[in-house]
Design a protein with these regions (language model features):
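Small-residue (G/A/S/T)-rich helix-start motifs and N-terminal tracts that mark the onset
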Residues: 1-121, 130-137, 150-282
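A conserved hydrophobic position in a structured secondary element of the catalytic/binding core
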Residues: 64, 124, 143
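Non-cysteine beta-strand/loop elements that form the S-adenosyl-L-methionine
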Residues: 138-146
């Protein structure tokens, strides 16, 4: 189904930033569970956790090996490394897609059973993209063109990364229809779609093309999904709005950090709070 394109703005993004009241506490402000990072990509665990924490979630629960937990705690000592109730899940950043290639292989993952037991809104990134359409809860996936080409081809829709890059608006809608999930297709112009909504983000700063920026986006998105979890469960399209807002915030944080110069993922994270403050003042 072809949708009308909605161009996302700062005003739209600000609506997805939940500000706490005097009655809030860390649990009511949203708890994000993360299953991210690996021995091959330990930085993903650090970056997703730090980005989520900087975006204003009430608590981050990190689930992985003790070695990765020590790395995470060195950068984000406020992270909790014990399992417990969460409002949203972020799964897959920095995890090998070849090792966990489908639902059956994910069933062998130590922590995946918690994702199934706590059926809350879930973000699937990188190594968890193969789970798209397999979970009962509201789900958003965050592929780039190559990952989406692999995912769609595995589902019988043969397409190349080059074809997706040539017409991302078409293929993000195709993916949403084929997979039955909300899709955030990363690129110089990012698109978000479900089977009703199509959102176009402003062109991103080229400095955002740096290692770890996808992990930062995943962390921002995880925090926003956790803080908007009730709204997402009550409004089908809210997950798409939150996904678009995460991409908007990431780009604005990158612009602020860069000021026309090169940046890294850590600099983007450091700029998130000031970026949120500016959006909330609009």
């Amino acid at each position: 189904m072809t949708r009308t394109v909605k161009k996302w703005s700062a005003r739209d993004a600000a609506k997805c930033i939940i500000t706490p009241s005097d009655l809030d506490h860390k649990y009511s402000r949203g708890v994000l569970g993360l299953i991210t990072g690996s021995a091959q990509f330990p930085g993903a665990a650090v970056l997703t956790t730090a980005a989520a924490s900087a975006t204003g979630v009430g608590m981050v629960r990190f689930h992985s090996s003790s070695g990765l937990a020590h790395l995470v705690l060195h950068t984000t000592p406020s992270a909790v490394v014990q399992p417990g109730k969460v409002a949203a899940w972020l799964v897959g950043s920095g995890i090998d897609a070849k090792k966990y290639s489908d639902f059956t292989t994910w069933l062998r993952h130590r922590w995946f059973k918690l994702v199934r037991l706590q059926s809350v809104p879930t973000i699937l990134d990188a190594g968890a993209l193969s789970l798209a359409g397999s979970l009962e809860q509201p789900t958003v996936i965050t592929p780039h063109s190559g990952e989406l080409a692999t995912l769609l081809s595995a589902r019988g829709v043969k397409v190349s990364a080059e074809a997706i890059e040539g017409d991302p608006k078409k293929w993000v809608q195709n993916a949403a229809d084929t997979l039955g999930v909300t899709v955030l297709l990363k690129g110089s112009t990012t698109y978000v779609a479900n089977d009703e909504v199509l959102i176009q983000l402003p062109v991103a700063t080229p400095w955002l093309a740096t290692a770890g920026s996808g992990d930062v986006l995943a962390g921002i998105l995880g925090a926003l999904v956790a803080t908007n979890a009730i709204e997402i469960l009550n409004d089908y399209n809210q997950l798409a709005y939150v996904a678009a807002s995460a991409a908007f915030i990431q780009n604005q944080a990158a612009v602020r950090a860069s000021d026309g110069a090169p940046i890294n993922a850590e600099a983007i994270i450091a700029s998130i709070p000031a970026t949120l403050a500016k959006l909330l003042k609009r």
